[in-house]
A protein has these predicted regions:
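Sec-dependent N-terminal signal peptides
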Residues: 4-14
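N-terminal, intrinsically disordered, basic low-complexity segments enriched in Arg/Pro/Ser/Thr
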Residues: 16-18
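Extracytoplasmic copper-binding redox domains, predominantly the cupredoxin/blue-copper superfamily
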Residues: 20-233
Length: 233
């Protein structure tokens, strides 16, 4: 009975603690006329080309959604986080499917496993070129192969490429805390479970640069902010 009461009290404390935390959410907008989608031909590799039926594939470096927002923007807390956070035991998955990296942009914590998969029946190589972390270049010639990696130092951002297929690219935001998000096909992001405090929030886009805002959140508050990027001249 005492054990049951202790468990109930523990869960009550955890629920109370999370209820006291805040959320920062919002959208990332694009100002001006959206650029024409950049199309990629995969004819250099017959197998890749066949997977897509000979059709060109839209690049993901600048994706303006139908509602005028931006996809694939990495939004994270740049300054203000206190304390230490343990990485999740669940790995982040970077898949190679259709001669393409999935997802194009993602976040991962220091010490968290990155699982790189090859879902294609052909050779890929995962070539990470960080500046602060140790680079790696691993070949995966067989469908279903997996490799695992971790990062030791926070870094914004770590680029990935495939030397076999030069159109393949991805980016990882490596942080020592879990407060980050990536915009979706509506341009939305959401950073949950922030302790009350003042934070610098940065939005990173691979072509359009970065923007920052300072926000202060109270216990249990949900704060909405917006970022707006425009085409570089």
């Amino acid at each position: 009975m005492k054990k049951l009461i202790s468990i109930v009290l523990l869960f009550s404390f955890i629920s109370f603690a999370f209820a006291q935390n805040a959320t920062v959410k919002g959208v990332v907008k694009f100002s001006g006329e959206a650029p024409k989608p950049r199309l990629i031909s995969m004819k250099a590799d017959r197998q890749c080309d066949a997977i897509h039926g000979g059709k060109q594939v839209q690049a993901e470096d600048v994706v303006v959604n139908q509602n005028g927002t931006l996809k694939w923007v990495f939004v994270y807390v740049k300054e203000g986080v206190k304390g230490k956070y343990n990485p999740p035991s669940e790995p982040v998955v970077l898949d190679q499917q259709g001669c393409w990296y999935h997802p194009h942009v993602f976040g991962i914590m220091v010490g968290q496993k990155l699982e790189v998969r090859n879902s294609d029946p052909l050779l890929h190589n995962i070539h990470a070129t960080p500046k602060k972390n140790k680079p790696f270049n691993i070949g995966q010639p067989v469908k279903g192969m997996k490799s695992y990696h971790t990062f030791d130092t926070p870094e914004i951002m770590v680029p990935f490429k495939c030397d076999v297929h030069p159109w393949m690219s991805a980016y990882a935001g490596v942080l020592d805390h879990p407060f980050y998000s990536v915009t979706n096909d509506k341009g939305e992001f959401e950073i949950k479970n922030l302790p009350p405090g003042t934070y610098t929030i940065e939005a990173w886009h691979e072509r359009l640069g970065t923007q920052t805002q300072t926000v202060t959140v109270k216990a249990g508050e949900v704060k909405t902010i917006e970022f707006t990027f425009e085409r570089k001249k």
